[in-house]
Amino acid sequence: MPYTITYQPAEDGEYVGQAIFSIEAFSLGEGYIVEPVLTDIYAGDCAAAVLMRVLNRFGFTESHTGSVEGGFYLATIKDGTIPNIPVSPGYAPAELVDALSSWGITLEDRYSENELGEFDYCYASGWMYCLNNVFPNVGFSDSYLSDGDVVRVQFTVAYGSDIGGGYAMGGSDNTSFYPVANKDRLSTLIATLNEHGIEIPDSAMNAATAIYASQEDVNAAAAVLQQLEDEYQQNAPVRDVIAKISAIGEVSLESASAIAEARQAYDALTVEQQALVSNYDVLTAAEETLRILIEELPVSASFSAPEIIALSGQQVEIPVTVSGKFEAHTLEMHIGYDSTKLTVNEVVPGAILENTSMNVIDFTTTPGTIYVGALCADAPMTGNGIDENVLLTVKATVNPEFSGTTPVNVDVNRM
């Protein structure tokens, strides 16, 4: 069966995803200058443009030849605000020093304070980059990134042979001093966990920054980080509840829906997940504060019966609407009315008086007023458009999803 694939490229400037960037000085034993970080990429951006954003984000400046648009070569990274540019060759890995000596290269105290660039420490040094574990034979300005790409900007002291990229400088595949592990997955996990604010274990960071770590050690470190990432994703509902509770803020009557939403989300968690909600005490305190606020409210309400069809000695049901206003909070409840009681059948979502029942205690009328109440009429009555006012005194039981109920005397004006 034939398939047709239609390719529609993103427009320039359109967000296309995230790449992972790191800046490394492993050849000097100095670890990361910039740990792996997720960075946004946009259609039309070359790797040079993204690199410039990363450097600026972390307070670095740079010097380069060519331009971002073409022929870009990163010459030097300079310390703008963060004093972590390596300036001493004393921590270079011993095996690398031995390999360099076979080339007749000795690392020297030849550098500029707070910057790192080409020809520092030896004549074969400079900046290179690998993209998805391959050192391209084109410059930054000629590489265009896709979502999920891993870009590792690395300092070399041997034309790339010390970091696994000697072939990019025109050498053969066997010009590398030692086997170099693929650290793309590990770099991606470090960037992801950093984004989550999760601390990277020392063992994993050591494997990431050791220039000649074995692939087995790198894979083991990635497995540890993957477990941390899996746990983070599994606890997404916990973080959602924590965020909902934090969003409650100072409690007022307007907080009722936010508190109810946080409570509902918390109750939906497993017992194990509930134990991880670090601010649960904030929720219970908010619930108690709201309960007190509701208890203290003076409650007034009015309702109307649009039409009386028939009244006799038998109980009849007339649909009415009850609206109550508590300061800035408006509640609407649809109820069914009969000659003995008012009972809430349905509550509009978000109403404070949820699950409330209202029972007629007493009623007062003026002579000649047609009314509906707990009575047995002597004869059937009919009427349309009740114009007279009838004052009913009722008792409301307030139960806003909290423990305990509070009786409140309510004067209800019925039109």
Predicted feature locations:
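Boundary/junction segments of secreted and surface-exposed precursor proteins
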Residues: 4, 12-23, 238, 242, ...
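N-terminal exported-region signature
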Residues: 138, 238-244, 258, 292
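Ubiquitin-like/PB1-type beta-grasp interaction modules and other compact soluble beta-rich domains
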Residues: 1-233
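Short, charged low-complexity linear motifs
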Residues: 110-114, 242-255
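Extracellular/surface recognition and adhesion modules
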Residues: 21, 189, 193, 204, ...
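Acidic, low-complexity intrinsically disordered segments
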Residues: 263, 292-415
